[in-house]
UniProtKB/Swiss-Prot annotation:
Interacts with the C-terminal region of Rne. This is Regulator of ribonuclease activity B. GO terms for molecular function: endoribonuclease inhibitor activity; enzyme binding. It is found in: Cytoplasm. Keywords: Cytoplasm. InterPro entries: RraB (IPR016716), RraB-like_sf (IPR036701), RraB_dom (IPR009671). Residues 117-140 have a biased composition (Acidic residues). Gene3D superfamilies: RraB-like.
């Protein structure tokens, strides 16, 4: 199970991200692409995690190398993507699920991010917006 202190830090970070997006005028009714970030020291370790995360229903990006600013060390990174409403409880459930998975595979969970959604955006399908009331955030 993920470290309770780290989970609490992530919960606080989630609320801060949501608050800042909404204060900046991001659309509260939009579906957001949530990018959960992972890193590992080697490709094989990250690949094992990526396969399991994909089986849970997340889209997983191709791994890429990233040189860290401090020390010049290179890590392998990927993201797990989901679409959901900007709802703290849904995102908390995903974060906990993915932090537990990362711990299982000895991979770093590096938080999540998303993008500003313009409430006046054109070309959006209204049927895709909003929160699915049956969505508990956990992917199966």
């Amino acid at each position: 199970m993920a470290n309770p202190e780290l989970l609490e830090e992530q919960r606080e970070e989630t609320r801060l991200i949501i608050e800042e997006l909404l204060e900046d005028g991001s659309d509260p009714e939009a579906l957001y692409t949530i990018e959960h970030h992972f890193s590992a020291d080697d490709f094989d370790t990250l690949e094992k995690l990526a396969v399991e995360v994909f089986k849970l229903g997340y889209e997983v990006t191709d791994p890429e190398e990233l040189e860290l600013e401090e020390g010049g060390e290179t890590v392998i990174c990927c993201d797990a993507l989901s679409e959901c409403a900007l709802n703290a409880e849904l995102i908390d459930a995903q974060v906990e699920q993915l932090m537990n998975m990362a711990e299982k595979f000895n991979v770093e969970y590096d938080g999540w991010g998303t993008y500003f959604e313009d409430p006046d955006g054109e070309g959006e399908d209204e049927d895709d917006e909003g929160m699915d009331e049956d969505d508990d955030g956990v992917r199966h």
